[in-house]
Each structure stands twice: as structure tokens, then as C-alpha cells.
């Protein structure tokens, strides 16, 4: 929202903004039409006319996610509104035409996330590697290689013959005898790599991991094949030495020139386990790596309604449309006041009622930063924010940061390079969130710098400082910096002077990477479970009297809470399915707003947990196109496999209907069409029975922004 609108908001009713919106729409100025419609909704959030004009304006601007959101909000107000129903149908047609023009219906490609995953060595791995090496040398007495020697050709031939005998014994199932024969062969020819590899395999089968690994370590590095390096990775992982396991898998991957997908996959499985293991220790889940990337699996059966796990954000920021609702800028706690909740009528309450509210309303401990641009629920949050990131982007310490908070206050509007006011920040979440990511990195790098008594962070310091953001994938290759030039330059200026002579250079590559890292992983959430109203009701418990009864009647309306976007490390590993089996809800984690991942359908041990990134009530073709556009994958879930795209093509066999005919739909769900009764029966058995009339999850999906992405924005997920 522009400054001009902010100045007058509150002095006009919703109808004033609505009239302005309609006027701008009629003139073709859809940006201003959308801006005024949003302003009307801020004043009167159940104004259905404002929802409609906002949806229309967003559609004209090709902001399809926003358009869909406003129409859905309108249907919440009036589920039978014919105008919205018709315009939603039109929106679906526009969406499909738009995606078709972009080539979105191109052939679906096979996808394997391992191609986009880094095997970079982590900064802290050097120390861990040395620690594991000491364990290998002292506990397992491993020798790195055999001493140089010359083997008698006769002995070498003798060893080969013994090895052939060992193979025959293996076929007979005599593993122990086969191991003995391998040992005899190695006594004759200690350099026989085949014998060492075979004995290692046999010892692993017997559970003798240490002996197996000793044979592999004895093989000179230059003689180790891809299979040997890969086998060593398996053994080291079994011994609980993940950094060495990664080292061996990395060698296998490099030696195979990335052709051995199994080695690359096993590397990522080890990495996922060591990164996420500590986070899942108290939950009935584990994080694994599949061809679709990091995934979460149940370790025991879970019933509907159970909480699979809780998560708290690494970094957060408000959604811009909630920027004026009071909340802690660090933890997202509601800072709702009596005046905000009860509105103008609060001043009309009689003295006893106001006195009771004042007495029982939770104590306000909120504090503001001296810059007056951030507010916190208490001094603890203020101190945490200061130590973690805020001192880098506080306008009182960094003069360039004023522009950042102005951009937030104006809901993404600012001056472009030509001095014209327009929307220069398109995403729904605040640009402050993006700035906090860099500020967190800078603060940690400076802390490490001071710890080592240096005046500048080293390369290692910067690498370690990025650890907290390591768990979040990045995908998207379009140049966002060129699409948001004003914000890109703003961030460069802000971090050109981070105090103490330290600066952080934000290149286009860095800007794009962090933008996508945020945009692809954000989840919306709020403090809806813990507001001052909840505190008031708790404090009123046991308080009797007429005034209390009156107050209780006045507190039946749900309080307005600010919605935030947060990056949650465990949650970020959840994959999507349109027939999701978990849903994301607001929760309290360690006393602060966070998210709960609640079971939506019964799970068995070993089942993968799936959330939904979008509104799954959309038609199949639109769902899949939207997911491809936003996340660069074609959904292959059961709902997408066994729902159809329309009456012109058989959902089961793909046969097209004749030009003047249409196929019959499923009589129950009406979302699948069949050319014959036989096809319908086949589809039912294959899987349609599982999704026919399957309940949709109506919980808020991921906070995604698709306006700056296109179908060529990424070739898959990449770990950053």
C-alpha cells in the first residue's frame, strides 16, 4: 500500500477505497485497483465486493495465486455467490491458457533430486573427520595401506586358484569356510585386491564390520574401484562415522563421474541422517533421502489427529497484508490490545467493565527498539533479536536500512529507477525476512571472528555462519535480481557496511539463491492459539459476577492475529501430495508460536508424510500446472493419477472422445471420466477407490509466490 493510502486509511470507510478501486479498474490501472481493494479489505475484511474487484485486478496482473486467494475468501463470506463462481471458472480457463502458452504441457521428465544436490564438504567437517580418524586408528586398528612388496608369481597363481575354490564354497553356502579360503589366498598374495574385497563382503554378511573395513583400508587408494569406495561408505555408516562415510561415497561419485546414482543417493542419505537426526530424536519420524529429495517418514503407526512433530522457525517475517496488526517482530506473539480487539465501542464500556478488562488483560511487557521500527513482546525477545540479526539492519546503526522498513510499511511499494512509485517488491512476505537471513549470517561470522581475535571474518567463518540455513533447499534459476532491481540494490547498500569494518557482498547469484531459498520454503503461521484474549479468558476463570458474564459475551469474536511466514527446518523436508496425509496447523513450541504437523490420515510405520503446497480442491490440470510453475515438478500422487482432466479423454486409458461426444464421469466424485465400464472398473481397482470422495485438507498451504517464477526457473531442487 502506498504512503498516500496509508496516510488516509482510517479516514475513509471501505466504500471509499472500493469506489477508487472500481474507478482505477475501469481505466485499466489494475495495480492501483488492487491496492485500493486491499485497503478496503483491511478496513472491512468481509466485504465481498472488495474480494471480487481484488480477484479481477490480480487476474489482469497475472497474479493468479492472489486472484485465487481473493475469490476463495469471497466464497467463505458467500459460498453461493454466482459472480465469484463464474469468475473462478474464467480464472481456471485463463490459467490453463497461460500455462499452455508457456509450454507447461511439455513432456513430463523423469526427475531425480540427487542431480541437484551438492556434496560440498561442510566447514566443521575437518575437525569431525580428524576425530573419526582417531577412532578408526585407535579403536579399530586400521592400516591405511599394505607395505610395498613384490609377490612371487607362483604365489600369485596359487592365490588365484584358492580364490576360485572360495567362490565354489560360497555357492554351497559355507560362508565361514569361504572366509578361511580368502585368508589363505591373501597369505599367499597380500596384494590380491579381489580376495580382500571378497573377504570384506563375506565378513559384512557375518556382521564382522570391523574386519570387513580393515580389508578395504588395506587396498591402496589408487586401486580402489567405485564399488570399493561405495562399499566402504556403507561400512563406515554402519559404524556411526558419517563424515568418513560421506568421504568414501564422494570418492565413488567422483570416480564414476556422477554416473553411479546409487553412490550419490547413499551420500545424501548419510548427510540427511546426520543433519536431521538430532532434530527428530524426540519425534516418531526420521528424515531420509529419496529421488524426490529429503523426505520425512513415520517410524511407528500414527493415528488421525496425532501430532507427528513440532517445529519452530529459524527466521520469520510478517506477511505484508498483516503488517498493521500488532505482533512481536521476533517471535510472532500477538500484542493485541483491548482497544484493538473491542474497537471503538471499548471507550463506551462502563467503568466496571473497563476496569475488569484492564485488571485481567495479560500484562503488556512489549518494548520497542530505539529505531521505533520494530516491536517485541518483551525484553528477552528484543535482546535475542539484537544479538541474532537486528543490530545489522537497525536503522539507528545502519542508515541504509531505513529504506527496507519503508518498503515494508508501504507493503512493497517504492520508487523505481525512474522515480515513479510502483510495487517494487512483489512477494507476499516482508522483505525484512530476506534481510534477516543475511543479517544472521553476518552476526555469526562476526562472532566467530571475535572468538579468534581477528578483525575480519575468514572464508571458514563465513561458511560456518551459513550453517543455520543449510537445511533449506533452493530451486529456481531465473534472475530475480533483474526483476527486483531496486530491492537488490537496496540490500547491497544495507550490507555494504555491517559495522566493525565488515561487509557482506550480495551478488546477483547470492540474491537469487537466498530469495528462492526463502520463497520455496516459507510456511504461513500465526499465534492463533495464544493471544491476549486467551490470556484474558484464562484469568477470568473463577471470577463470577454480571460484569464477567457481559465480558464473556463480548469475547466470542475471534481476535485478529498477524500471519507470519517462517522457515522451519523439519517442515521444509515435507514433500507434497494432493492427497496429503498430514496438515500444518498453528502451534506453540517452547512457549512461542510455531507449527504442529498433525496427522490427517492414519499412517503406518515406514509411510512417508506428505503435506500440500496448494489448495487441492482445484481441478487436477490446474493443480499440476501450478505446482510445475511454482515448484518445478509434476505431481504423481494418487489423486493426480486417478482424477481426470475432463470428459474429452478417458482417465484410465487416455483414449480421446469423438468430437461430438463426451465420456461419462464417476457417479460419486465426478472427477474422473471413462470411455467404458471396463475402464472404470480397472481404474477403481488400480487406485480410484482410494481417492474417490477423499476429504480435502483445508489447512493453509505453503506461503508460495509464483509471480517471479516461470516454468524454466529451475531444473529441479538444489541443496544450498
Identify the function of each model-found stretch.
Residues 1-49, 53-720:
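Short alpha-helical interaction motifs and adjacent low-complexity tails used for partner binding
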Amino acid at each position: 500500500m502506498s504512503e498516500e493510502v496509508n496516510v488516509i486509511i482510517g479516514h475513509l470507510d471501505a466504500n471509499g477505497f472500493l469506489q477508487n478501486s472500481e474507478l482505477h479498474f475501469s481505466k485499466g490501472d489494475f495495480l492501483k485497483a488492487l491496492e485500493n481493494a486491499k485497503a478496503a479489505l483491511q478496513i472491512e475484511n468481509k466485504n465481498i465486493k472488495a474480494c471480487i474487484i481484488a480477484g479481477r485486478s490480480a487476474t489482469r496482473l497475472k497474479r493468479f495465486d492472489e486472484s485465487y486467494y481473493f475469490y476463495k475468501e469471497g466464497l467463505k463470506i458467500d459460498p453461493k455467490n454466482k459472480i465469484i463462481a463464474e469468475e473462478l471458472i474464467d480464472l481456471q480457463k485463463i490459467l490453463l491458457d497461460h500455462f499452455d502458452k508457456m509450454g507447461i504441457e511439455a513432456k513430463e521428465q523423469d526427475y531425480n533430486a540427487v542431480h541437484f544436490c551438492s556434496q560440498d564438504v561442510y566447514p566443521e567437517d575437518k575437525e569431525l573427520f580428524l576425530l573419526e580418524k582417531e577412532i578408526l586408528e585407535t579403536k579399530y586398528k586400521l592400516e591405511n595401506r599394505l607395505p610395498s612388496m613384490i609377490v612371487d608369481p607362483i604365489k600369485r597363481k596359487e592365490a588365484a586358484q584358492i580364490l576360485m575354490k572360495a567362490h565354489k564354497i560360497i555357492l554351497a553356502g559355507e560362508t565361514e569356510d569361504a572366509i578361511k579360503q580368502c585368508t589363505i589366498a591373501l597369505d599367499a598374495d597380500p596384494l590380491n585386491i579381489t580376495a580382500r574385497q571378497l573377504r570384506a563382503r563375506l565378513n559384512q554378511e557375518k556382521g564382522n564390520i570391523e574386519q570387513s573395513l580393515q580389508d578395504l583400508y588395506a587396498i591402496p587408494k589408487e586401486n580402489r574401484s567405485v564399488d570399493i569406495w561405495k562399499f566402504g561408505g556403507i561400512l563406515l555408516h554402519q559404524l556411526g562415522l558419517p563424515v568418513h562415510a560421506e568421504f568414501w561415497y564422494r570418492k565413488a561419485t567422483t570416480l564414476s563421474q556422477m554416473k553411479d546414482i546409487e553412490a550419490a543417493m547413499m551420500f545424501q542419505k548419510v548427510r540427511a541422517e546426520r543433519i536431521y537426526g538430532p532434530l527428530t530424536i524426540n519425534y516418531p519420524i526420521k528424515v531420509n533421502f529419496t529421488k524426490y529429495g529429503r523426505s520425512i517418514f513415520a517410524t511407528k503407526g500414527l493415528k488421525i489427529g496425532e501430532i507427528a512433530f513440532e517445529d519452530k522457525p529459524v527466521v520469520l517475517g510478517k506477511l505484508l497484508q498483516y503488517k498493521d496488526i500488532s505482533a512481536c517482530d521476533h517471535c510472532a506473539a500477538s500484542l493485541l490490545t483491548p482497544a484493538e480487539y473491542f474497537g471503538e465501542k471499548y471507550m463506551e464500556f462502563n467503568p466496571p467493565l473497563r476496569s475488569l478488562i484492564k485488571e485481567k488483560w495479560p500484562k503488556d511487557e512489549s518494548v520497542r527498539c530505539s529505531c521505533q521500527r520494530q516491536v517485541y513482546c518483551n525484553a528477552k525477545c528484543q535482546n535475542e533479536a539484537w544479538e541474532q540479526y537486528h543490530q545489522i539492519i537497525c536503522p539507528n546503526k545502519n542508515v541504509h536500512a531505513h529504506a527496507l522498513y519503508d518498503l515494508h510499511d508501504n507493503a512493497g511499494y517504492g520508487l523505481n529507477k525512474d522515480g515513479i512509485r510502483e510495487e517494487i517488491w512483489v512477494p507476499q512476505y516482508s522483505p525484512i525476512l530476506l534481510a534477516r537471513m543475511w543479517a544472521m549470517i553476518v552476526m555469526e561470522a562476526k562472532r566467530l571472528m571475535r572468538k579468534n581475535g581477528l578483525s575480519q571474518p575468514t572464508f571458514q567463518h563465513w561458511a560456518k555462519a551459513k550453517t543455520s540455513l543449510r537445511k533449506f533447499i533452493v530451486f529456481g534459476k531465473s534472475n530475480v535480481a533483474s526483476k527486483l532491481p531496486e530491492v537488490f540494490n537496496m540490500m547491497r547498500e544495507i550490507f555494504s557496511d555491517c559495522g566493525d569494518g565488515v561487509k557482506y557482498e550480495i551478488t546477483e547469484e547470492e540474491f537469487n539463491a537466498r530469495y528462492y531459498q526463502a520463497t520455496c520454503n516459507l510456511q504461513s503461521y500465526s499465534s492463533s492459539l495464544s493471544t491476549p484474549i486467551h490470556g484474558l479468558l484464562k484469568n477470568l476463570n473463577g471470577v463470577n459476577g454480571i460484569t464477567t458474564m457481559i465480558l464473556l459475551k463480548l469475547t466470542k469474536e475471534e481476535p485478529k492475529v498477524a500471519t507470519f511466514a517462517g522457515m522451519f527446518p523439519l517442515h521444509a523436508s515435507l514433500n507434497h501430495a494432493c492427497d496429503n496425509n498430514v496438515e500444518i496447523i498453528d502451534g506453540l513450541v517452547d512457549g512461542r508460536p510455531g507449527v504442529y504437523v498433525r496427522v490427517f490420515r492414519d499412517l503406518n510405520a515406514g509411510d512417508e508424510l506428505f503435506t500440500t503446497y496448494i489448495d487441492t480442491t482445484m481441478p487436477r490440470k490446474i493443480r499440476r500446472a501450478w505446482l510445475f510453475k511454482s515448484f518445478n515438478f509434476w505431481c504423481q500422487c494418487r489423486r493426480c493419477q486417478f482424477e481426470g482432466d475432463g470428459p474429452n479423454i478417458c482417465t484410465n486409458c487416455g483414449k480421446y472422445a469423438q468430437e461430438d461426444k463426451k465420456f461419462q464421469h464417476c457417479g460419486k466424485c465426478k472427477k474422473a471420466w471413462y470411455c467404458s465400464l471396463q475402464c472404470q472398473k480397472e481404474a477403481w481397482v488400480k487406485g480410484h477407490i482410494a481417492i474417490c470422495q477423499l476429504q480435502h485438507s483445508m489447512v493453509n498451504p505453503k506461503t508460495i509466490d509464483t509471480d517471479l517464477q516461470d516454468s524454466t526457473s529451475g531444473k529441479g531442487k538444489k541443496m544450498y
